């Protein structure tokens, strides 16, 4: 299929669609029994690094739910391992040793995709063959700030105080770290596009922990450089910053065609702020999928009503789908969006 034949691609550019496209963040995951069956015999990192299995898992929600896009099964921390930190899952991710000093930063190296992550590129090539034009394939990576949060903290955190301490006490070291991560993110995502990804999403899961002023100073320059470096491929770029409702104008300044919204942001307000030149993606609260199907349909209708038929809307969750969600509710959501918006 040509790019103009995909509702997902058309929505990213604000072009007419036959119906509102929908896909779900973390749509390949633990809520699907077929995914859990694979995970019974394979550890998470091994799954990410085995192209045949990663491709199989990527395709599961396409077949089971009828989503309008596939997203590469991987993890945002994969490129960090190649930079020189050890990556473990216990079961949450742990990075050792944490990056805390100027010497730690200098010891990091910029990723070389074909050498360091050939499995990611082979998974993309395999998926393009297996999808055979059914739906477009989204590649993805972490935003520089979110990757820095994990690298400095060494694990997930509620407040990321080690990262903020570095940011405020050693701004030159912080800037050098962010430059190295941005350089890695650029070559990593460019390699995904060259391998065949038809859209790219940049996940900034922790960008919302900062004030708008700090986001503008410490995050925006690097996210803008990353997105700018991906613009020559002619594919849609989606920028998702969780918790960014108070600074959507700054998020839009980073570039790309689509701003992802979490569920704490009014879609109607977001569209007013962003204007007609920027598409939006979102933004159902993932926990709604734990409810009855009449509740799911009510919330789908509310979000569609907030969008008011404006072009450039991709329906999605406001964050990743929860492992506890019944698969039939996820399938109902996709069907509901399609049914209510079919032209």
UniProtKB/Swiss-Prot annotation:
Gene3D superfamilies: 3.20.20.210. Pathway: Porphyrin-containing compound metabolism; protoporphyrin-IX biosynthesis; coproporphyrinogen-III from 5-aminolevulinate: step 4/4. It comes from the Bacteria. The record marks 75 as: Transition state stabilizer. CDD domains: URO-D. Belongs to the uroporphyrinogen decarboxylase family. This is Uroporphyrinogen decarboxylase.
